[in-house]
Amino acid sequence: MATLLATPIFSPLASSPARNRLSCSKIRFGSKNGKILNSDGAQKLNLSKFRKPDGQRFLQMGSSKEMNFERKLSVQAMDGAGTGNTSTISRNVIAISHLLVSLGIILAADYFLKQAFVAASIKFPSALFGMFCIFSVLMIFDSVVPAAANGLMNFFEPAFLFIQRWLPLFYVPSLVVLPLSVRDIPAASGVKICYIVAGGWLASLCVAGYTAIAVRKMVKTEMTEAEPMAKPSPFSTLELWSWSGIFVVSFVGALFYPNSLGTSARTSLPFLLSSTVLGYIVGSGLPSSIKKVFHPIICCALSAVLAALAFGYASGSGLDPVLGNYLTKVASDPGAGDILMGFLGSVILSFAFSMFKQRKLVKRHAAEIFTSVIVSTVFSLYSTALVGRLVGLEPSLTVSILPRCITVALALSIVSLFEGTNSSLTAAVVVVTGLIGANFVQVVLDKLRLRDPIARGIATASSAHGLGTAALSAKEPEALPFCAIAYALTGIFGSLLCSVPAVRQSLLAVVG
């Protein structure tokens, strides 16, 4: 199409033999000495007047109809290009609208469920209840009207892929404000927490992996191919430059007009959010060898902290106030971290779609999956409580790190069931556990001789939740379905377990 538009109507290409035959077909019946003759042999046209040296021949079109025909072709090509551009724009608008509507419904459902549970004084994760409701609806539709279940899955697929694409970002705020969270924790307690986190991750990995192997040997279920899981699209250069522009403009604006949006937290929100997103985009594009020691989440958190440090220095306010504006925990005056963590509920709701997609896999390997997840979750909670007591860690800190192997969204819900906990420490410990798993899980699994994809997937997700899952599945896609299921079920079962008052009391008794 572009070539058509770029080629002139009268061009040297018209002098080709094929083109000459086409142009003169109406008038040539014979030739003699360069003359074109009619059927009766009379001279019609002398071509010698139009002859040019080789390489410079230029044969004028002999018919105005042919000229009009080629002009029409060019106009049609231009019309086609315009139509193509319009259709592309229309598709993009429809896709964006689809994403906004589907994601908006999930966020709205999460918000109203939270409000309802708070109003009813229900101490149970509202997002988990919503996840069960969505999964139940999908299962009912699948048994009665399968087309309706597929239609529902297709409708929410853009929102699901959006959540998967940006999932690590929702974990970052706890790392960004870590300097404020650990300020009151003694250094000796910090060392003990690090020991529990690192050793606990390794122990949970072993328990989940070897449990899965033992159950697989008993049930002897053959592994079959799972449903393919869609992968989010990579980041584009346009996204990088767009967020860079937002950062520069909002940073300068906040520097000269610190309360232009009403409060300092709102004014700081655009540049702190864009710096976080930029760090993640840049970190995701790093070579795999660098990602092993410099995970995208670390790059993301470091980018936000450096932006806060630069703004604190330039404005003279210092680092702490800017970090305080990053995560305010005030609904009426949110910061960038509050916006990101506001998606955590939608992460839990999205578990319903991933579980439904892999329902056949869950049914086939139910024994391995559920046994490993239950044993690993119970071990993780009670071993953390016991080791915390043995090393002399403060009870409030021990309780805060109990759900170290459970995804942030549900870990925060779990610690909210206990009194006197540090939720910022909880989130930070969960993220650090995931980072340890992301960096070392493949090497450790190989050392432990856990070769089975099911065991590797379950062990990774049960010990290092989403971050470990992403790291392993990037190189071992066959383990991804088992990672996704174990990742969701570990959080679900841990939340259900800690929602039982007797279990909470037993954990507190172990903690001392």
Swiss-Prot record:
It comes from the Eukaryota. Disruption phenotype: Interveinal chlorotic and premature necrotic leaves. Bleached leaf phenotype when grown under ambient air, but normal growth under CO(2)-enriched air. Residues 1-76 form a transit peptide. The modification N-acetylalanine is found at A77. It is a multi-pass membrane protein. It holds the Pfam family LrgB. GO terms for molecular function: glycerate transmembrane transporter activity; glycolate transmembrane transporter activity. Keywords: Acetylation, Chloroplast, Membrane, Photorespiration, Plastid, Transit peptide, Transmembrane, Transmembrane helix, Transport. Expressed in leaves, stems and flowers, but not in roots. The keyword Ribosomal protein does not apply. One of its GO terms (cellular component) is chloroplast envelope. GO terms for biological process: cellular response to water deprivation; chloroplast organization; glycerate transmembrane transport; glycolate transmembrane transport; lateral root development; photorespiration; response to abscisic acid; stomatal movement. It is found in: Plastid, Chloroplast membrane. InterPro entries: CidB/LrgB. Glycolate/glycerate transporter required for photorespiration. This is Plastidal glycolate/glycerate translocator 1, chloroplastic. The gene is PLGG1.
